[in-house]
Every structure is written in C-alpha cells, then in structure tokens.
C-alpha cells in the first residue's frame, strides 16, 4: 500500500505559511463570525468559533473551528458539547481540506459536450445560469406538466435537504428522489405507521443499562450518538449486545455478539419477542394501556372504519378487522375499539358498569368527529397534571451537568379495568351473527412463536441458546425500581436495506414498546423537540404564505401504483420507478431534474440510474464538487461548505442538543448558500415565499432571524385535560405563538449567546415536552403536529391537542397496523411484523451454485461518509482503495491473498475491490464497501463503474411498502483479478488512457489535492 507520507501536522504547518486570507463575498449576508472578532485582534491571533460539524450528514457534533486571519486552519472537538463529548473524528478534521480544496466548484458552469462524454464545462454568470434554469423548467412544465420535473436530495445537511423539498411545491411536482428512501426513511416510515414519527431514535446519551447496538458501527461514524459517545455508552452499560454479521470495532467488547446471517434481522427480532413474551418480561401496564394489544380482532366480518389524516393533512379511510362499536350496534361509533375487561364483574359489583357488559371501549376519535370523548376510555378519569406526577429520572452515568429529565409515574387505569390480552370471546355483531374474537396480543404471540429461538437459529445461524440469552438479558430489568426497561434498541441502517425494511422496523418498534422502553430514560424517544427545530428551519423547509400543490398532484407520484403505501407516506417517490420513467416515459415522461447533494450511487441499480441521467433533457446540480452524477448535468451551481454558512441546528435524534452551524469564513468566489439559490429561483418564477408586502422573497438575514423567534422565556401554548367519568374538559395555557417575546431578536444575538453558553439541553428549553418522559401519558407526544413537530409562528399552527396517546389511527402504539391492513387488504400476514427471506439470497437454490457467497455492504469507514471525501488527501492516503472483507479460509479456497484485487460478480454487474482478509466475517459471507468512485479519473463518471457496489443488485428487488432497494444479502461469486482478466492487463482499475487510479498511500497525485488559498475571490 505504500507509506503514509502526509500527516495532519504537515498540513497544519502548510496552512500556516501558504497563501493570503480568503476575501469576503456577499455583503448582503451575515459576515463570518471570526471576521467580526478580528476587529480587535491582529497578527497571528486566532479565534475559536463554536459550531456544529457536518463532516458527515448525521451526528450533530459540537466542534470549534480555529480561524486565523480570515482562514480556517483546523477543526477540534468542543469539550463543552455534552452530546459529542469533545469528539472530533477524521472526517471533521479533514473538513479544512474540503473547504480549501483546489477542485472546489467556484462558479456556475454549463456543459458544452454531449452527455455520456467529458462535459466540457464552461463558466457562466449566475444570472445566465438561473435564467436558463427557469426557462427550461417552465418549458418542460408547459409541455408535460410539473410532474415531468423531479427533485433529488442526499442526506441530512438540512440546508440542502429541506431547500430541495420546498421545490416540489414551487414546481408542482410529486416526484422527489430521496436518499431517505434507504437511509433512516424506512425507520421513520414504519414508526410513523405504528407509533410516532422517527421513534427509532434512541436516547443513548443517557447511558442505558443494557446497550443494544443493532446493525451498525456508530463508534466509527454517524447516527445521533456516535464515536466517543457510543464508546462511553457501551463501556458504562451493565450489558452490551452487538447484533451484526461482522465483528464491528465495539463488537469484540460486547457481552453478547449476535452473529447473524445478513438479512435475517426480522427473524431475530421476532425470536427476541417470543422470548420476552414467553418469559413474561413485557411491561403489562404499558402493553394494555398504550398499545392496541387488547383490541379485539374479528376475522368473520368485513373490515370497516373511518377517515383519518395522512402525513400531509389529507384524508384516507381506515378499513380494519379490529372490533368497533359500529360493528355491534347500528349507528355506533367506528372510532370506539372494543376490549374484553377481565375486571368487569368486580367493577359492576362496585357500581361501575360498562355499556356492553364484559366489553369496554377506547375512543380513538382524535378529531372529535362524533363525540368529545376521543382519546379516552369508557368512563375514564384523567387529569393532565396528575399524569405528570412523578420524580426526577435517575440514570446512573450521566455526564456532570447533564439534565436527568422528569419521569412521570406509570398511570394505572381509572376505573380499574383490566383489558384482556389472552383468550377468545363471543360477541354478537349488529347483523345478529355471533362471532369469536381474540385480542391482538394473541395474534402477536402466535406470530412470535413462529420464530422461537430454535426456528430462528436455523434462519440466522445463531445458536438458539445464544438468542435466548441475549433476549433475556435485554428484557430482564437490572433495576426494577426504576419502573422502566433497561433501554431501547439502537437499530441502524443495515436493517433498512432489505425487502423486509418496513417489517423489520415495525418489529423493533414493538419490541421496544412491550419491554417498557418507549419514551423512557435511555429508551427510544424520537427526534429532539425544541422551538427552533433546527432540522426544520423555516427558511429551508417551508414557505409561510406560499401556495401548495393541489392533492391531485400528489396522486400522480411515480411508484404509487406499485407501492400503495407511498400514497399514505408521500415523502418520496420510488427512485427505481422514477429512473424507469425517465427511460421509458411510463407512466408519463420525466424530463428534468434538480439535485441538491443527491447521489445516484446510493440506491437502485447504478447502471440503470446512469442510463436515466444521461437521458434527461435538462438537469441542474448544486454541489461542492465535480462528481460522477453531475458529469451528466447541464448546469452546475457552486454551494457553500458547512464552515461557510449559518443554520440553526438541533439534534435530529434523541440527544437533546440545541445549537447552531455558524459561519466561520466566507465561501470561495461565487459559491452560494443553498437556501439563497432556492429563494432566487422562487423570485424568478414569481412564486411568493411570504405574503408580507414588499418582502415576498426575504433575504437570508431575515430568514435566519425568523428561524429562532420562537425561542423564548415564555411558556409556549399547551393544553391540559380533565376527564371525569368519561366527560372531558380542557384548558389552554401559555403564550400563543404570535404573542411570544423572542429571547433573541436576531440571529447574530443567538449566535453570540451560543458562543458564550455553548450547546443548550432541550430538556431545559422545553421541560413539558422534551424534558418529560412518558409523553404518551402526559399528552406531550401530541403537542406538535403529527410528523415534523413544526411550529408556525404567524398562524399558531403545528400545535397538537395534548391528548394522551399516539398519532396513529387507534391513538395507540399499533402492534396490529391498521395502516398496513387498510392499504394491503390482500396481505393479512403484513398486519403484524413478519419476516421475509432476502431475494437472491442463499435460500435461492438455483443461484447458489453459481453465486455461492452472500454479500453484505454499507459498513462505516472512519475516513469517509458514504461517497464523500475520496478527494481529501488525508482520507485517501489512509484508505486509498475499496476493500472487500473475506474470511481467510474462504480466500485460500479462491487463491486470494491480502491486498489482491478481486472481481465480485452477479448477473447484473461486476466490480473490483481489494481483498482484506478478516476472521470477523463468516466463511460464506463477504463484506463490500459502497459508493466508491475515483475523483482522479477524468472520464465521464469519474470511474464509478470500477467499484460501485450497487451495479451488483437487482433493480427491481424492493421492499413492497417503501420501495427501498435490497442493497445487501444477495449471492455473488468472486475470483482474483489478474492481468489476463482485467482491462489494460492491469488488475488495478484504469481510466480510458490506461492510467491506474490512486491505489497507494504514496501516490504523488495526492499532493495535488492539498489545500489552496488562492483564487477564492
């Protein structure tokens, strides 16, 4: 591999002696914080700017950017950032190399050569670029409709992710290709369906007693609590369980390693569920009161239901076999779900009598369509303030100064009903027919029994005794006095990359719930809630006063016919179907694309996606770099790096941190901030962003000021409920949205406070909401709108009803999914979590003869974030080539040695990667690296064809609900790359001239990528 020759110290030394200070750009925007500070310093004095790192797209690590004379010279960890503990990983430190890279895009460009060839980029002005975009979009829209223009976005740098989303409204298109479809999206999709949006996020930062790390290596990179935090959490846990097909870095330290076959996560989750149920390790009160486990299933009647709200606010019809009052009584409510009360006779003797004898009901009429008792049980007594009674949480290993949070005591039923979880009961329907009904729990119990440890062992390859031991360790409370479980499950990206993505995530959500780990300390809590909601800042996510497309536009979304639940979800179109539509024109032509940080290599078969990109009439790409994808663009626009921009920021997950990404230095030359570009497009298209006369297209200063105005010392509006004998009353409290006094009048004031205070704890900012656990009990789970939790300052929108429960059709965590049942009536097996074998896996007897090895992929690499950083010299020097991990015994069978280039092949494509012999993968499994390309290759596409793993996948192997690509657990064959079987007689990939890629750490081309400080004016 050669010797490492370029150290971080070498670069810092170079940075100190090279070039002049970067010049200012864009007088209309906030100046870089460091520049303002320089008025009082001189010479070699430096400023440390607190900010939020975006070296990867996941973790909100607090860092300091060290700026000297207008130039950023290094990034270091912020020890005061409680969520990241001063962590500063290799990607973060290398951000300086990205910001000052000689290959950064500085100016708008247009292509001059045909697509599929080297683009022949020509510099143009911003005015020419933007006018060309408007003209082409309007022409295509006039010919084919807004749906002929698609939007694409990558992962969560929020300023591009949500700027792109508003473009859907602007262009009136339902079609957006999202990395979200294969990255966190299936988790968010599934949890929205069965509990609450993004309840997959786990509060690892409060250090659970049992830490379950499922399908990821967050000790290396990514996810809300990663790197140093993950190591600390795992080290302090009483029990650490790692579930992974390969031995991850922290896996070797785990108490239990569940070494499963790739793609069998769902079977293992159901096996754990079986153990939990059979050993009665579940939280009985939670299961009975806050899930639909006691609701009764009637399989001898036609499903019926009621209209309820989609994620976008439109309506759809629930059709369910769950027994309702309307099924047993003419004129009865379809919202009242019946349960059998084991205590009915005792209560009757005490003078509490149910309307239907042994059966009582829960009313899920959350919008008060029929009566006011929605959200409550028959005859219930409930008081919001009593629901909050409890104590401060008592997690053992919090960092000094970290807020514990308020833990309400579990609230028993009042009156003391006892909903049955088991049994079979007779009831007479309104047509006079007597039927037998069973609780959902009976069906769930039977489903889990299909995957008891002995069965799951055959599927997963893990011994049954080890499955039972790990599940028991997770479910058995180490300290029962806490009143909650040992912790949630940090299930990560791997579980989403199969045709069972949604079912996998539903299985985890239910498992967390029944063990008493939903919204509890160290449990799964969902996205952090704070008033600024940095993940959804106003200027990049929504446009107050702007118009939204009519509902019929959303009904045109590509892929909705193949995946009906996309019509319920509505946050992405199916990427596979979109690329097909570009090529075939079916179901209608898609002729243009707007892309902000999206990457065609992340999902679908890459070869098919490339064909589609080359077929577009017009394509605009916003980026920092020349990339494989934008080699097919017609116009590319240069954008700012994270150290060159301002953005509010809160933890996307459960870490509970609030801060900011702060502009440290000016962007180079003519690079602009994504929201400014989108706003300019809106102005040129006469699409009004606000309804404020004279400020229809506000500048970035106004938008930033607007983004923090709900941060206040006032208590925001909330509602308390008092229910007596089933009769509810409510009272509003706090200050209405439009009347709050902002704590900081301007963005600059907020940033100044952030520099002085550091990261705030959301538990302190919103004590009734994020600062309180068991929000399903207090009503705070429904305090904000049903998906994003967005607050609309001007209209007071986004405020929920504060009723206890969840935002599901039944207002319960749904073990039996009414959403799935309603959209897939012909698949009764999908109503409960289930397991499906991966297509093209080892159970495919015909294929395994030719393709004997199971491929997995997607692991975290310390120096890269998916496709990013391949041109950063520190990173590429440390990890110059893609590696395929092969068990040494397997490698010996194929005559492969450490460092050999290896061909990996399926019937859909073949690639080359370098052998890395590792006993941490099983003998019949190989582990491939993903999204590789070679910036040094100047041919169109920058050599993505050489090693990009998704060339190997079946384009049409998808999850039947979300459309997610089956990216892992498929069969491949391997053989050593030799001069005889390689182009140019070279096992190392070469460009069209025969020049090899950079494949050693001492390649002199790496030095050509060292930072430059010239040409930024």
UniProtKB/Swiss-Prot annotation:
The active site consists of 91 (electron donor/acceptor)
The recorded induction information for this protein reads:
Up-regulated in response to dopamine.
Tell me its cofactors: [4Fe-4S] cluster; Mo-bis(molybdopterin guanine dinucleotide)
Cysteine pairs forming cystine bridges in this chain are none
Enzyme Commission (EC) number: 1.-.-.-
Give the note describing cofactor binding and stoichiometry: Binds 1 [4Fe-4S] cluster.
Q: Its domain of life?
A: Bacteria
Post-translational modification remark: Predicted to be exported by the Tat system. The position of the signal peptide cleavage has not been experimentally proven.
Q: Name one Pfam family in it.
A: Molybdopterin
The cross-references to SUPFAM superfamilies, in alphabetical order and at most eight, read: ADC-like (SSF50692), Formate dehydrogenase/DMSO reductase, domains 1-3 (SSF53706)
Q: Which residues form the 4Fe-4S Mo/W bis-MGD-type domain?
A: 45-103
Please provide the record's keywords in A-Z order.
4Fe-4S, Iron, Iron-sulfur, Metal-binding, Molybdenum, Oxidoreductase, Signal
InterPro entries, from UniProt? Answer: Asp_de-COase-like_dom_sf, MopB_CT_Acetylene-hydratase, MoPterin_dinucl-bd_dom, Mopterin_OxRdtase, Mopterin_OxRdtase_4Fe-4S_dom, Prok_Mopterin_Oxidored, TAT_signal
PROSITE patterns xref list: 4FE4S_MOW_BIS_MGD, TAT
SMART domains given for it? Answer: Molybdop_Fe4S4
Similarity annotation = Belongs to the prokaryotic molybdopterin-containing oxidoreductase family.
Q: Per its record, how is this protein called by name?
A: Uncharacterized oxidoreductase Elen_0471
User: What is the native source organism of this protein?
Assistant: Eggerthella lenta (strain ATCC 25559 / DSM 2243 / CCUG 17323 / JCM 9979 / KCTC 3265 / NCTC 11813 / VPI 0255 / 1899 B)
Name the lineage.
Answer: Bacteria, Bacillati, Actinomycetota, Coriobacteriia, Eggerthellales
């Amino acid at each position: 591999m050669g010797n490492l020759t370029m150290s971080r110290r070498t670069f810092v030394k170079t940075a100190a002696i090279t070039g002049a200070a970067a010049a200012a750009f864009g007088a209309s925007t906030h100046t870089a914080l460091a520049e303002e500070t320089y008025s009082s310093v001189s010479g070699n004095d430096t400023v440390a700017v607190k900010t939020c790192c975006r070296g990867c797209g996941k973790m909100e690590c607090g860092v300091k950017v060290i700026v000297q004379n207008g130039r950023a010279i290094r990034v270091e960890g912020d020890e005061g950032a409680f969520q990241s503990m001063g962590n500063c990983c290799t990607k973060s430190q290398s951000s300086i190399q990205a910001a000052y890279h000689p290959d950064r895009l500085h100016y708008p460009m247009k292509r001059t050569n045909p697509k599929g060839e080297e683009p022949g980029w020509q510099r143009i002005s911003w005015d020419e670029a933007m006018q060309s975009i408007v003209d082409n979009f309007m022409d295509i829209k006039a010919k084919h409709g807004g749906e002929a223009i698609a939007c694409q976005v990558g992962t969560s740098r929020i300023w591009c992710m949500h700027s792109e989303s508003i473009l859907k409204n602007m262009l009136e298109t339902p079609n957006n290709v999202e990395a979200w479809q294969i990255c966190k999206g299936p988790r968010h999709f599934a949890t929205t369906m069965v509990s609450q949006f993004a309840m997959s996020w786990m509060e690892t930062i409060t250090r659970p007693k049992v830490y379950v790390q499922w399908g990821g290596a967050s000790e290396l990179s990514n996810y809300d609590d990663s790197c140093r935090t993950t190591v600390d959490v795992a080290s302090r846990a009483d029990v650490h369980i790692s579930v992974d097909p390969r031995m991850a870095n922290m896996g070797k330290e785990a108490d239990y390693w569940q070494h499963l076959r790739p793609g069998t996560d769902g079977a293992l989750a159901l096996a754990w569920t079986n153990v939990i149920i059979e050993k009665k390790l579940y939280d009985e009160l939670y299961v009975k009161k806050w899930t639909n486990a006691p609701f009764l299933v009637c399989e001898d009647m036609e499903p019926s239901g009621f209209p309820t709200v989609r994620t976008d606010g439109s309506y759809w019809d629930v059709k369910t076999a769950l027994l309702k009052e309307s099924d047993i009584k003419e004129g009865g409510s379809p919202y009242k779900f019946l349960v059998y009360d084991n205590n009915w006779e005792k209560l009757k003797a005490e003078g509490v009598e149910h309307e239907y004898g042994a059966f009582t009901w829960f009313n899920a009429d959350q919008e008060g369509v029929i009566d006011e008792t929605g959200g409550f049980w028959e005859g219930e007594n409930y008081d919001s303030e009593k629901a909050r009674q409890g104590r401060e949480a008592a997690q053992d290993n919090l960092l000094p100064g970290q807020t514990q949070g308020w833990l309400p005591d579990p609230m028993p039923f009042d009156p003391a009903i006892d909903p049955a979880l088991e049994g079979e009961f007779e009831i007479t329907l309104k047509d006079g027919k007597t039927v037998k009904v069973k609780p959902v729990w009976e069906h769930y119990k039977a489903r889990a029994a299909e995957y008891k440890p002995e069965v799951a062992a055959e599927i997963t390859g893990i011994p049954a005794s080890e499955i039972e031991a790990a599940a028991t360790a997770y479910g058995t409370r180490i300290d029962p006095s806490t009143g909650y479980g040992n912790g949630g499950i940090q299930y990560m990206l791997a579980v989403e990359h199969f045709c069972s993505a949604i079912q996998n995530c539903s299985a985890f959500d239910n498992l967390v719930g029944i063990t008493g780990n939903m919204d509890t300390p160290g449990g799964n809590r969902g996205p952090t809630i704070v008033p600024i909601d940095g993940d959804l800042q106003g200027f990049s996510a929504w446009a107050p006063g702007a118009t939204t497309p009519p509902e019929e536009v959303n009904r045109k979304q590509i892929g909705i016919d193949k995946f009906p639940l996309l019509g319920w979800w509505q946050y992405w179109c199916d990427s596979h179907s979109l690329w097909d539509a570009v090529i075939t024109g079916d179901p209608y032509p898609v002729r243009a694309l707007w892309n902000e940080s999206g990457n065609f290599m992340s999902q679908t078969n890459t070869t098919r996606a490339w064909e589609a990109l080359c077929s577009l009439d017009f394509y605009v790409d916003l980026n920092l770099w020349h990339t494989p994808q934008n080699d097919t663009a017609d116009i590319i626009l240069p954008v700012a790096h994270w150290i060159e921009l301002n953005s509010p920021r809160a933890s996307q997950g459960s870490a509970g941190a609030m801060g900011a990404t702060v502009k440290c230095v000016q962007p180079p030359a003519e690079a602009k901030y994504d929201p400014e570009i989108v706003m300019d497009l809106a102005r040129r298209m006469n699409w009004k962003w606000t309804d404020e006369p004279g400020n229809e297209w506000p500048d970035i200063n106004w938008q930033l000021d607007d983004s923090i105005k709900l941060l206040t010392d006032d208590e925001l509006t909330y509602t308390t409920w008092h229910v007596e004998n089933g009769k509810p009353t409510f009272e509003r409290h706090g200050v209405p949205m439009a009347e709050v006094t902002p704590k900081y009048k301007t963005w600059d004031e907020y940033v100044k406070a952030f520099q002085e205070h550091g990261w705030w704890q959301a538990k302190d900012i919103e004590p009734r909401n994020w600062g309180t656990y068991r929000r399903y009990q207090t009503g705070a789970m429904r305090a904000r709108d049903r998906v994003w939790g967005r607050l609309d300052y001007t209209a007071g929108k986004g405020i929920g009803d504060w009723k206890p429960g969840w935002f599901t059709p039944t207002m319960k965590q749904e073990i039996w999914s009414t959403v799935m049942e309603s959209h897939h009536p012909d698949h009764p097996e999908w109503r409960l979590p289930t397991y499906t074998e991966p297509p093209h896996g080892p159970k495919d007897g015909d294929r395994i003869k030719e393709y004997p090895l199971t491929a997995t992929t997607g692991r975290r690499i310390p120096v890269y974030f998916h496709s990013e950083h391949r041109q950063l010299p520190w990173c590429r020097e440390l990890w110059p080539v893609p590696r395929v991990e092969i068990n040494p015994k397997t490698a010996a069978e194929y005559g492969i040695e450490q460092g050999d280039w290896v061909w990996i092949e399926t019937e859909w494509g073949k690639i080359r990667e370098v052998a890395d012999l590792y006993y941490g993968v099983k003998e019949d499994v190989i582990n491939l690296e993903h999204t590789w390309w070679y910036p040094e290759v100047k041919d169109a596409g920058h050599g993505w064809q050489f090693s990009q793993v998704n060339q190997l996948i079946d384009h049409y192997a998808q999850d039947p609900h979300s459309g997610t690509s089956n990216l892992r657990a498929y069969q491949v064959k391997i053989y050593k790359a030799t001069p005889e079987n390689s182009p140019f007689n070279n096992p190392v990939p070469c460009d069209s001239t025969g020049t090899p890629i950079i494949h050693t750490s001492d390649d002199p081309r790496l030095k050509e990528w060292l930072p430059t400080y010239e040409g930024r004016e």
